[in-house]
A protein has these predicted regions:
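Active-site-adjacent mobile loop/cap segments within catalytic or ligand-binding domains
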Residues: 440-443, 448-450, 462-465, 491-551
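Bacterial N-terminal signal peptides that target proteins for export
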Residues: 1-13
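Solvent-exposed loop/turn segments at secondary-structure junctions
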Residues: 379-382, 419-424, 446-451, 468-471, ...
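Stable alpha-helical elements in mature extracytoplasmic
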Residues: 168, 369, 392-395, 399, ...
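Signal-peptide-cleaved, periplasmic/extracellular N-terminal interaction regions immediately downstream
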Residues: 22-33, 50-69, 75-78, 89, ...
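Short, solvent-exposed loop/turn segments in extracellular or other extracytoplasmic domains
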Residues: 95-101
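C-terminal motif of bacterial Sec signal peptides marking the signal peptidase cleavage site
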Residues: 17-20
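Active-site histidine-acidic residue metal-binding/catalytic motifs
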Residues: 355-440, 450-453, 457-459
Length: 551
């Protein structure tokens, strides 16, 4: 599961389930394992283990800060499936292999610890597991320390009230004045060669989600700097935040550049066509995918396009249209003859180039023949660990290797982003894949839950995408995994994940099962279940490409 791992797990849960497990008091009884869906075979049987009693808590780790409001889960192993276990006096389910997981009320704030007692006949093992809670700030309201009577300074008449409102408006007007640009900055250092792999990230708030992806060398007005972020202006109606280190100050007397979209043209390009938009200095932009078009929003730009020249051999672009949305915002809409398959954005000779990728030729009898598929075994770095110590990165490499074999048997060439236990940076995995011109990217992961979620409510299978053109692949792979694994169908989810942000190919991330659940962790150790996971993904990839010509 990629970082940040827990936000995605919450997304996958039905809203009612989240609400139910957030406020309800958990029952001390044992929750049943989920029933398999459809006609898929059940999970493999859990092997019997009967070793020495040894209590090992995997989660939460010792002295971890637990953020749940009133209840949480705890899991690990005790060495024997024949033993019983209580945690703070509550019976916990012990699985045949000695794994345990239970969901119970949080320990009291003054004694934040779990007391675990494992018993098998005359043998007993005990452990104390200490956790911590977040330090909560105590907000002191003025009303809590002010006298009960109304202070004389508060307005008491209608005239006083109006005067106070005018003062607030004047204060707000002064604040808006202070938001005028204080200078110009360049976002990163531009590259002489075409480089689509380096981007500067724009966020709606400091520390927020990734939304805009700017080309290094883009020049924008600076509004201010705070807490490691630079606030920049895209146009009069939109300000965003970038890392302060990415905003390089330019000379104070630098004149503002005029950015005007001139006549555009469409030309043939490797693996597709280019839409060329002459603009001058680099500008911030945003690309939106629609059903059969791509819309490029250009910030701080005026449109003055008279002619669009179309490549004589182009079969992808139908029309190119432009509008002036606001005095400082232009939009260029590229209407296509089919749904987008992939694209890149880069700068060339002071022009923004939108490179559209053509679809591969598909043999309906052998849809994967001649295609290159990137298989990305998730982690390390990071990753979850199951109750008996199965590390996510170990399991995903085994499953990914099986997936490679199956795809190759069906005619594909496979690019593995890793083949060993060595860590590969998240950002490098899409770069490998883009440079290899893969036709699809599939990242294999195992899921987990955030603090406070009842792990027995909806433990199943989910698939994630970020770019709109990746959604059909996500749906087909989700169908394939659910059919093979037989777990609860958690559906297809949009999520802003690093490895699926690539635009040149469809990219998805699979969460086939939950490694933190004892029965699913045990299944993930078996060759049978590993093969089912891999085969479900392969079936989905094959079905996606079989249906690609009709999309």
């Amino acid at each position: 599961m990629p970082l940040p791992r827990f936000a995605r797990a919450v997304l996958a849960l039905p809203l009612a389930a989240i609400v139910a497990c957030a406020g309800a008091t958990p029952a001390p009884g044992i929750d049943p394992a989920p029933r398999p869906s459809g006609g898929a075979p059940p999970l493999p049987p859990i092997p019997q283990v009967d070793g020495p009693l040894a209590i090992r808590v995997v989660y939460p780790s010792a002295n971890a800060v637990v953020t749940s409001r009133d209840s949480n889960f705890i899991f690990g192993s005790i060495g024997s499936g024949r033993a019983t276990l209580t945690i703070n006096g509550v019976a916990a389910r012990v699985y045949p292999n000695g794994a345990f997981m239970t969901y119970l009320v949080n320990p009291p704030a003054d004694t934040p610890r779990y007391e675990l007692v494992a018993t098998r006949g005359a043998d007993t093992a005990r452990a104390t597991h200490v956790i911590r809670y977040p330090v909560r700030d105590v907000a002191v309201l003025d009303s809590a320390v002010a006298p009960a009577a109304k202070p004389d300074s508060l307005p008491t008449t209608r005239a006083d009230t109006i005067a106070a409102l005018h003062a607030r408006v004047d204060s707000l007007r002064r604040q808006l004045t202070r938001d005028d640009p204080i200078g110009w900055v360049q976002l990163g250092q531009p590259s002489v060669a075409m480089d689509t792999d380096r981007t500067i990230i724009g966020k709606p708030i400091p520390g927020g989600t990734y939304k805009w992806f700017f080309t290094p060398g883009t020049i924008v007005p600076l509004l201010g700097r705070t807490a490691g972020y630079a606030r920049i202006r895209l146009d009069h109606d939109l300000d965003v935040y970038v890392d302060s280190a990415d905003a390089i100050d330019l000379p104070a007397n630098m004149p503002a550049a005029r950015r005007i979209v001139q006549n555009m043209r469409v030309r043939g390009a490797p693996l597709g066509v280019d839409v060329i938009m002459p603009l001058g200095p680099r500008v911030p932009y945003f690309v939106e995918e629609l059903e059969r078009s791509l819309v490029v929003t250009l910030y701080g730009v005026r449109a003055n396009t008279d002619i669009v020249n179309f490549a004589p051999q182009d079969s992808m672009v139908r029309t190119v249209e432009w509008t002036q949305e606001t005095p400082e915002r232009a939009k260029v809409t590229v209407n296509l003859r089919a749904a987008p398959y992939g694209y890149l954005v880069f700068w060339e000779n002071n022009a923004l180039v939108l490179r559209l990728r053509g679809r591969p030729a598909i043999d309906q009898r052998h849809p994967l023949a001649g295609l290159t598929i990137a298989v990305d075994p998730g982690h390390p770095p990071g990753g979850a660990t199951g109750p008996t110590g199965l590390y996510e990165g170990t399991a995903t490499l085994v499953i990914g290797t099986r997936l490679k074999r199956i795809l190759e048997e069906r005619g594909a060439t496979v690019l593995m982003t890793r083949t060993t236990d060595s860590a590969i940076a998240l950002g490098d995995r899409p770069i490998f894949s883009r440079r290899a011109n893969v036709h699809a990217f599939v990242s294999i992961h195992l899921n987990a839950y955030p603090d406070g979620v009842n792990p027995f409510v909806a433990p199943g299978t989910g698939t994630y995408f970020f770019r709109t053109h990746s959604e059909p692949l996500a749906r087909e792979v989700q169908k394939g995994m659910v059919a093979q694994l037989g777990l609860i169908n958690l559906g297809v989810n949009y999520d802003n994940l690093a490895v699926v942000r690539g635009t040149w190919y469809p990219a998805i991330l699979c969460e086939g099962a939950f490694v933190i659940l004892p029965d699913q962790e045990a299944a993930l150790r078996t060759p049978e279940f590993q093969e089912r996971y891999a085969r479900g993904v392969a079936d989905g990839v094959e079905n996606y490409f079989r249906g690609l010509p009709s999309r």
